[in-house]
Structure formats: C-alpha cells, structure tokens
Amino acid sequence: MSEDTISAIATANGIGSIAIIRISGDRALEIASKITHKDNFTPRYASLSNIYDFHGELIDEAIVIYFKAPFSFTAEDVVEIQCHGGFIVAQSILKTTLLHGARLATAGEFSKRAFFNGRIDLSKAEAIAQLIEAKSEDAAKILAQQMKGSLKEYVEKIRDDLIHILAYSEVSIDYAEEDLPEDLVMQIQAKLKELKTSLNKTLQASKAREGLMQGFKVAIIGKPNVGKSSLLNALLNYNRAIVSDIAGTTRDTIEEQVKIGTHLIRIVDTAGIREASDEIERIGIERSLEAINESDIVIALFDASRVADYEDEQILSLIESKAGSKNVLHVKNKIDLEEKFYRSSLEFDIEINSKEGVEELILALENIMNQANTSDEMMLISQRQIGAVQNTLNYIDEAFEPLQEQELEIFSFNLNEAIKEIASITRPFENDEMLDKMFGSFCLGK
C-alpha cells in the first residue's frame, strides 16, 4: 500500500500503567534497532530493552515485540513498544521514532493498511471500530462474532450463489440463438426466491435487533404531572429531570442512557400530552409523538389517584395507533394515594417516591430486551451494510421479469449489480471516498 513507515501511540491518552507505541512498515525493525541500540529481535518474542532518544539519552525501559511481515496486523513489519504509561514517556518515544524516519500515522491508517494488504475485510474493520466504541455487552458479543468472520462467510455464500446463477445466463448470451430451458428458468427463480428469503430475514432481524447495538429507546408517555420525570430519575437512580407539581414543567424531550442487565437503554422523558396552551408546549407535544414512533419500548404512565378522563383515553388510543408492534408497558403511578383510576389492562402499579414496584418494571424492561437477543439470524451492524443488502434485494427483484421474458442481457445486468452490492459489504474496491471516511473515524493508533 505504501512505502512509508508509520508510527503512533496505540493506547488512550492519559495516566495509566502502560502505553503502547506501534510502528508499521519496511523500516520498523531498523527504527526499533536505533532506539534500543540492539540488532537482534526474534519475531513474536518480548524483549526487555532500554529506549533511547535521538541523542542517545535514556527515556525508559520497555518491552519490545517484533512481528515480521506478513504475520502482523497490517501484514507489514510491525514493532510494538510497551512502555510505562503517562503523557511524557510515550510522547518522547513517539517523537524519537519520527526523528528516525517514521511518519505519524493518520487516523485508522494501521487498519486501512490491514484492509488493503488483505488481513481484514471491511466488515471486520467496521466491527473493530464499533467494538472499541461498544457501550453494552450485547453490542460487544455481536461485534466479536463479526470479527471472527461470520458476516464475511454469509456474504461470500450469497455472492457465490449469485455468480453460479449468472454463469447460466452468460453462457446462453454467448450462444444467442438459444434460450434457457424452461425447467432451468424455474430452478433459477426458485434459487433467487431462496436468496431473497435469506436476505429479507437478515434485514428484518437486523432492524428488529438494532437496540442491541445502539441501545433500546424507551419513551415515557403520559399526561402532564403524572410522574414521567420522576420515573426517569428513578430509572437513572439520580435526579436528571426537574420535578414539579406544575403541569407542563417538561416542555421538551429529555434523553439519558442507563444500563439494565447487559443492555443499554436510552430513556426519553417526553412533554405531557394534552391540548397545548402555547406554541412551545405544542412543539414539545409533537416531539413526544415522534418519540413514540422512534422508540423500541413505550412506557404509558397514568395517575392512579385521578379518575380516568378523556385525555387518558386519548393517550391510550394514541399509543395503540402509533406503537404498532412495539412493546408497551402500561403503568399506574401514585398507588400510595386513594385509587380512582380503574383499568384492568394496566400491568404495573408503582409509587415512584418510595420506589415501590419500580424494580418489577425494570425487570419487565430487561425481559423484553432479552427476547430481542434470541434470534440466530445474521446481524448487520451499520447503515452501510443494511443499505447494501437492501440494494441487493432490489436488483434481485428487478431480475425476475427479464428472466421470465428471456431478456438475458438485462437479467445479467441486474444480477451483476446485485453481486457488486453484496460484495461491497466486505470489499468495496471502487469507493475510496467511503473508505477514507470510515477509516478516518478510527483512533490514531488503530
């Protein structure tokens, strides 16, 4: 990929026990020899070495490991220097490697070299980047599977099947006087339908399980002053939202994150739903309705101490119409007061101030999220991957009619485009701008 030898600090900035400086390229071993004053490094063996600056002054005592090409992350010669942590030592060693001829790596350049040198495919690169940023055990487990190559195997199987089908068409085009036999057309149609079913299952499962990756979005919905902000604070276990007896205190949506079990949830406290008294409140209520549409789970909160009125009925009807197949938890708050709100369909009774019933509500949320993690279907982890699968499906759909009409050149064109789209999940050779953008989001030492 490049004749440059690059260097960067691979660990996070800050105070710590250990920092790692990574060097990759043809001159990596030469630079390691210059900064250690040692000539012999056995590949993949840790060597305790003194590290010297450009003028021969001792910087630190460190562990130096040499990975000989192609048996390294980048498939180039790589040297990793494990020194004492902190700002000064690591920066001094990095500066010395640059003075000896290395270039400071750009963001994600080590991973980009690994990609272009065939050590990783693009799906694995995406998994690495997202694993570093993972905020829950759910996401980490999914990403670990993708790093092992599960998505790559799936993509290559789909691609190979499409190429196999395309071969029949290409042969018939070469012998233009001959149509595909009817029984072969039926076999191809059946195979394309089978591939469509597989891709649709993957697409649907990925969208349904998006909460495992991004965090499950939970919207708290209800009339003003039923305790939505208090419930948000109780779930977070600290006071995030202002709580007041004045109806309409929350005039906009508030979103916060919290872990429940192995899951990350994004809780949205919404403005109370009622007839708006001013423009600002109207906008807040509109955003509350948007929160229902965008959420994975809805908590519908009602005041047990008040008789159900027209607004309560409206909220129940609204949630039923907007929530669709989403999980909805109906909750009565203020059960310490005389109960006047009678609805047998409400599953949970809570008193937020004493936290009575809150633990049961949290367990119900956890159970819903656990159920989302039971699918064995392949998981797509980015909008780029989802878009590629959707485009593949579109081209397969476009191929059926020309196949039936024996318009084989059009059929072949659509199949070729489908092959390009599915292959782009692991190796999009022709989109340098997209690659630069993706690898540029990595940290410097990755």
From Swiss-Prot:
(6S)-5-formyl-5,6,7,8-tetrahydrofolate binds at R22, E80, R119, K446. Mg(2+) binds at S229, T250. It comes from Sulfurimonas denitrificans (strain ATCC 33889 / DSM 1251) (Thiomicrospira denitrificans (strain ATCC 33889 / DSM 1251)). Belongs to the TRAFAC class TrmE-Era-EngA-EngB-Septin-like GTPase superfamily. TrmE GTPase family. HAMAP family: GTPase_MnmE. Its EC number is 3.6.-.-. Homodimer. Heterotetramer of two MnmE and two MnmG subunits. Residues 215-370 form the TrmE-type G domain. The lineage of its organism: Bacteria, Pseudomonadati, Campylobacterota, Epsilonproteobacteria, Campylobacterales. Its main location: cytoplasm. One of its GO terms (biological process) is tRNA wobble uridine modification. This is tRNA modification GTPase MnmE. K(+) binds at N225, S244, I246, T249. Binds 1 potassium ion per subunit. It is found in: Cytoplasm. The gene is mnmE. One of its GO terms (cellular component) is cytosol. One of its GO terms (molecular function) is metal ion binding. Its cofactor is K(+). GTP binds at residues 225-230, 244-250, 269-272. Keywords: Cytoplasm, GTP-binding, Hydrolase, Magnesium, Metal-binding, Nucleotide-binding, Potassium, tRNA processing.
